[in-house]
Amino acid sequence: MTKLHYKVKDISLAAWGRKEIEIAENEMPGLMTLRKKYGPAQILKGARIAGCLHMTIQTAVLIETLTALGAQVQWSSCNIFSTQDQAAAAIAATGVPVYAWKGETEEEYNWCVEQTIVFQDGQPLNMILDDGGDLTNLVHEKYPQFLAGIKGISEETTTGVHNLYKMFKEGKLKVPAINVNDSVTKSKFDNLYGCRESLIDGIKRATDVMIAGKVAVVAGYGDVGKGCAQSLSKMGARVLVTEIDPINALQACMDGYQIVTMETAAPLSNIFVTTTGCRDIVRGEHFAVMKEDAIVCNIGHFDCEIDVAWLNANAKKDTVKPQVDRYTLANGVHIILLAEGRLVNLGCGTGHPSFVMSNSFCNQTLAQIALWTKTEEYPLGVHFLPKILDEEVARLHLDQLGAKLTTLTEKQSEYLSVPVAGPYKVDHYRY
């Protein structure tokens, strides 16, 4: 059977998608600078990158950066609801194979990911760009014959990074990987500032609820949880936080939030947001005591944080509109579930703004370049990008914000034992 060149919702959406991509490019100065810097040398020539990452307008700019640098690229989304169909169409129309549409079934999702492994000429992938680990796991488990030819994996998100470390610890990881998530210009920007804007956008588009005056509980106080708590608080909600880690819990307390258990929060809260990357955070016993029309949503990568199966088994489901379901419990109370417990900011909104994603995707691009061109520096294991590149990503975004850096004098440089051009911090500095 001949391989499809692409599969998207509607290729006629390409013109709309192209207009949005052009606007996004102006908001993604880092990626556009990397095109100018590395494009002429075609630094990724020969790379066959299989990508599994939310097929959004911002990702379209990333894809076109990779191809501008000489790579061949095939793409699927890493979530069944996160594709922006106009973005998928616009990229497919350029000849890049895209297999993604909003509202895939689980079976369709798996099919889409699998389409990215072998290219149109019959050659397999030799690089992986992943978000969450589904593509990495698929290749390791189902296509081990291709592993020897893969130079590297770059992983976008916390959940996928956990997967890489677990695989490496168990001896199952067969390809060198770069942990993009823990680059400072990713985790401290995308995870925090991105979620701070996109969480509210998703909730508002889905429900139009007034957040001011409500009680909201945020499960988890990592970078994602911090951003979510800030946004809810700034909208006027009283924010509760649940945590397992005493350090994060103390941070939340010092930021003015009350640390409670989910058992305490469940009957008090109007809005529930899970951010943990763990399973079984909101369970049946919590649903049973919730307020009328409590809004429950997740902004962690996978859909295991909220026990949706319990709701489906114990409550009557009524779909209000796509990605908004209102459940009726046996006690007559209604619960509103967003995006079927998957990423609310992408399922009900359009995800993070372009500017902050330029930070993340610069890290992805630099990781792909590093793994492709400096293979000998990345033995089997999970690595980080060097600090000097992290600083460079930040530097690429300052002009657009009108920021002017101070330059160290030679005496200051000598006094601090810090190079004038950086890096300015030791690797373990926490920011």
Curated annotation (Swiss-Prot):
SUPFAM superfamilies: Formate/glycerate dehydrogenase catalytic domain-like, NAD(P)-binding Rossmann-fold domains. One of its GO terms (cellular component) is cell cortex. Its cofactor is NAD(+). GO terms for molecular function: adenosylhomocysteinase activity; cAMP binding. Disulfide bonds: none annotated. SMART domains: AdoHcyase (SM00996), AdoHcyase_NAD (SM00997). Keywords: Hydrolase, NAD, One-carbon metabolism. GO terms for biological process: establishment or maintenance of cell polarity; one-carbon metabolic process; S-adenosylmethionine cycle. NAD(+) binds at residues 157-159, 191, 222-227, 243, 299-301, 345. It catalyses: S-adenosyl-L-homocysteine + H2O = L-homocysteine + adenosine. Substrate binds at residues 56, 131, 156, 186, 190. InterPro entries: Adenosylhomocyst_ase-like_sf, Adenosylhomocysteinase-like, Ado_hCys_hydrolase_NAD-bd, NAD(P)-bd_dom_sf, S-Ado-L-homoCys_hydrolase_CS. Adenosylhomocysteine is a competitive inhibitor of S-adenosyl-L-methionine-dependent methyl transferase reactions; therefore adenosylhomocysteinase may play a key role in the control of methylations via regulation of the intracellular concentration of adenosylhomocysteine. This is Adenosylhomocysteinase.
